[in-house]
């Protein structure tokens, strides 16, 4: 099919998808944003996640997102596809329903009565009357006969309300609870206020200041406080406040609202309003579309079907949302930020709303590959976080949050450094990394290293010292120590220091149980915990079981292969993940958590792609000389576990991680070990992909005979030369060139099988490492 007809078909189908009739005119230019479905993954619930996403109407990495709100105030599931009522249109900063929101407020048009209550003002809607795009949202509110449209910039937005003929048309502004302020300024057609609502991770002086300007004079003003609406009042400060302003409207009359906000001040919010300029609504919509197309056009894929295009660009879109900008541009044009760590307004970048336990795996490597200049700003923001709080973040929203395990800020920082994204203050970076290995945050135990005293002395976090998820912590700390070793080597640190982190990087060996060939929690006395079930979720592990976590040796798969008795045994254990039925032990949680249910319903054995610990596992076949098995299972995952619809994911999307996995895998490679410059090969999904790098170079990936049957790599060339390695190097890709794949329906069992074809492993590729041993102590004798 010609490319032109593909785009025409895509646009027509997308317009029907969002409930708008297809139009005859088609933009012949490359228009990838029209493939994006912001509703992908929104058909989720507490019991079962198909993404746990909401339609984020935003700019890439925007400080504010906007979303229609179907859930009640404070509900983490703020938009659910199965809902049939909208309560408002919310400025949101929520990265996950489990983390929830902060600084949010909502706007809602109503007709007839000035209803402020979120249930009474709610309106029925239909997805047939809804258009959701990355840069624009439109919906018909049947209860009020009002069409609401919105478009965002980074820190501002514009609404366009189309009202019916009515003498009692209103707009509600809800500053939500937990302490808020509102003021109506009718002589300026303006409302100002602030929201202090949050879910943690903020200083005492936290506020989100907002300014709303209307283009129609008010005929009605009221404010809400203390559960009552007070007509004629213009200002309120209380736990939960808001405002209602009204107009007389003609049929089809349009009212615009300009909105901007700031975490710094009302004055800064007014400065942020300038992002809208003097453009009208339609011009701003087009500018937003252009911004998204500029970013999404960095990768052009061809030779797939419509669902694959939709899925790819929807995942690409999700990969460009988090971490969000938490900085602003002041009146002098300087980059400044309100610190969510110490409450001060300080110079420099700040980003937030991401959990590194999830996103170190592929989201940040994707940014290093495709948007290194943006990630440079993010890295500077991490340095600022350390300066302002004494720790690098592990889960930030907006400040430190108590969630998940690991010290994976080390991976984020080191992977960027190794791929040429280098901060100016390397001394502070290294100092912060070392500090994190020897300390834990005094109030947020997931920041720094909980159990570092045991880990640094024994070589593992014991099972029986009342530190949960101890085996998971040990495995991740070992990988994190390898990351630190990588940058210490680059910085020329002393040999004694290098050897310390090299030995700690081998600490994963301390948890390997040769009887089960799996990782297992270990008691302080050096004996393995008992009884042991590889199917038990949680306990020694994090949101998974031993079958999932035993592969968390990102930096040294060959070391794990050696522990398991060689490549054949290793492959047998990989195979077992798919062969074992989706059995589980949920006794640690006292019930089935959603991650367990997501594994069982996907019918792929004990492979749990809906959560992060195992997402790299399939690529490990490459290290054992059987890359064709990776090629098979990767296509299975892409075909069976991703769709472009509301049930599009097989678990939590998690701030770009599960989406970036798909984008990488569809291109044919994946960063198994962030901190190296290598990407491990899978097999491409499309017949052609063209990557446009920031440095101006282009990489073309050709697989002309790719199909749903031709999923195996028969042969491969890179810039015309035969290529047998099971990995690609970042620096080689960045130079641009052409990769040609010849695909077939049968595996080539003679390609990628030699030692020189294997990807990086710490114990093989680094001199002298095989002579080192992990930190360890001998088991103490049992008392009689």
Model feature map: region roles:
Residues 712:
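Extracellular attachment/recognition segments
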Residues 24-364, 368-411, 417-475, 483-510, ...:
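Accessory carbohydrate-recognition regions in carbohydrate-active enzymes
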């Amino acid at each position: 099919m010609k490319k032109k007809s593909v785009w025409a078909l895509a646009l027509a189908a997308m317009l029907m998808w969002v409930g708008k009739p297809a139009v005859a005119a088609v933009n012949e230019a490359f228009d990838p944003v029209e493939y994006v479905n912001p509703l992908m993954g929104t058909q989720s619930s507490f019991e079962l996640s198909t993404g746990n996403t909401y339609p984020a109407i935003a700019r890439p990495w925007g400080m504010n997102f906007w979303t229609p709100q179907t859930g009640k105030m404070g509900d983490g599931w703020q938009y659910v596809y199965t809902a049939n009522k909208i309560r408002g249109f919310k400025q949101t900063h929520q990265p996950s329903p489990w983390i929830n929101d902060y600084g949010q407020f909502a706007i809602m048009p109503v007709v007839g009565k000035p209803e402020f209550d979120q249930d009474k003002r709610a309106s029925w809607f239909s997805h047939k009357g809804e258009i959701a795009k990355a840069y624009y949202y439109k919906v018909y509110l049947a209860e009020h006969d009002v069409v609401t449209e919105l478009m965002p910039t980074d820190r501002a937005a514009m609404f366009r309300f189309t009202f019916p003929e009515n003498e009692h048309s209103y707009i509600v502004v809800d500053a939500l609870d937990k302490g808020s302020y509102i003021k109506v300024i009718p002589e300026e057609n303006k409302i100002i206020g602030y929201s202090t609502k949050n879910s943690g991770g903020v200083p005492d002086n936290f506020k989100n200041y907002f300014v709303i300007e209307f283009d129609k004079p008010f005929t009605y003003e009221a404010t809400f406080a203390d559960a009552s609406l007070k007509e004629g009042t213009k200002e309120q400060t209380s736990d939960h406040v808001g405002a209602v302003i009204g107009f007389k409207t003609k049929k089809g009359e349009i009212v615009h609202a300009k909105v901007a906000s700031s975490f710094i001040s009302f004055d800064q919010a007014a400065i942020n309003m300038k992002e809208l300029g003097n453009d009208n609504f339609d011009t701003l919509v087009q500018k937003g579309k252009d911004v998204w197309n500029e970013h999404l056009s960095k990768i052009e894929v061809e030779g797939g079907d419509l669902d694959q295009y939709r899925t790819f660009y929807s995942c690409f879109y999700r990969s460009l949302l988090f971490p969000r900008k938490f900085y602003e541009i002041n009146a002098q044009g300087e980059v400044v930020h309100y610190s969510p760590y110490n409450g001060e307004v300080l110079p420099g970048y700040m980003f937030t709303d991401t959990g590194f336990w999830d996103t170190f795996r592929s989201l940040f490597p994707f940014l290093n590959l495709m948007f290194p200049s943006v990630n440079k700003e993010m890295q500077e923001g991490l340095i600022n976080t350390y300066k302002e709080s004494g720790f690098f973040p592990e889960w930030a929203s907006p400040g430190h949050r108590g969630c998940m395990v690991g010290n994976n800020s080390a991976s984020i920082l080191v992977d960027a450094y190794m791929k040429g994204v280098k901060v100016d203050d390397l001394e502070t970076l290294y100092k912060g990394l070392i500090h994190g290995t020897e300390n834990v945050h005094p109030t947020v135990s997931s920041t720094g290293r909980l159990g570092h005293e045991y880990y640094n002395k024994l070589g593992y976090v014991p099972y029986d010292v009342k530190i949960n998820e101890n085996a998971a912590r040990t495995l991740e700390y070992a990988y994190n120590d390898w990351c630190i070793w990588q940058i210490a080597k680059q910085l020329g640190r002393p040999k004694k220091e290098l050897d310390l982190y090299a030995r700690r990087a081998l600490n994963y060996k301390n948890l390997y149980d040769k009887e089960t060939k799996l990782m297992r929690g270990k008691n302080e006395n050096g004996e393995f915990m008992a009884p042991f079930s590889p199917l038990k979720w949680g306990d020694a592990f994090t949101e998974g079981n031993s079958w999932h976590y035993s592969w968390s040796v990102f930096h040294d798969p060959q070391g794990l292969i050696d522990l398991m008795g060689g490549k054949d045994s290793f492959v047998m254990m990989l195979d077992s993940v798919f062969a074992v039925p989706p059995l589980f032990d949920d006794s640690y949680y006292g019930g089935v958590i959603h991650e367990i249910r997501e594994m069982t319903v996907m019918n792929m054995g004990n492979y749990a792609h809906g959560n992060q610990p195992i997402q790299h596992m399939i690529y490990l076949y490459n290290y054992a000389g059987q890359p064709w098995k990776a090629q098979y299972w990767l296509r299975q995952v892409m075909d069976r576990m991703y769709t472009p619809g509301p049930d599009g994911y097989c678990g939590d999307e998690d701030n770009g991680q599960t989406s970036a996995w798909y984008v990488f895998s569809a291109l044919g490679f994946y960063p198994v070990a962030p901190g190296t410059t290598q990407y491990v090969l899978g097999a491409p999904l499309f017949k052609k992909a063209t990557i446009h790098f920031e440095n101006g170079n282009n990489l073309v990936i050709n697989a002309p005979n790719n199909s749903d049957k031709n999923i195996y790599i028969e042969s491969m060339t890179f810039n015309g030369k035969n290529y047998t390695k099971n990995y690609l190097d970042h620096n080689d890709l960045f130079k641009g060139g052409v990769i040609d794949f010849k695909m077939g329906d049968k595996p080539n069992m003679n390609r990628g099988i030699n030692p020189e074809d294997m990807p990086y492993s710490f114990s093989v590729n680094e001199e002298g490492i095989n002579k080192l041993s992990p930190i360890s102590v001998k088991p103490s004798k049992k008392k009689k």
